[in-house]
């Protein structure tokens, strides 16, 4: 523990049904994925597709927060594309409707996984005087040194994704490095 279960969608009724089902499994957290860039998900307006409709993102989050007693967190991206980066506003709106933490992938949906994640926007969210909830970085945290950089930026933590695929011991490597500044021996 803690155990979090992630849900995604763009339809209020479906999302609320998902919350009801998830609650029966007794998790500690419900996380909403507003960051998945996969075409199959986005084409339904879900995942990062919701970044085209911030009012819907806000209203879904508000309804889910109201529906459950569990803490609700959100994972999202900087924006739909480079012309719609509104992550500071998004974070404020999510916090205002009861979101308890936000994880931000440092790319837009248009970037998918190309280029390098831009953590400066995530740092802007964290340094926003209005922000009171934890802010986590996601994207390109693929070495222990990069995890340390997240810590040194003053962010509340890192959400590691692709770096752990096929490398589940990566979490231990990061934890050890953050504690000792040395790498685990192979």
Task: Give the ranges of each region predicted by the language model.
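Flavin-dependent oxidoreductase catalytic cores
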Residues: 1-186
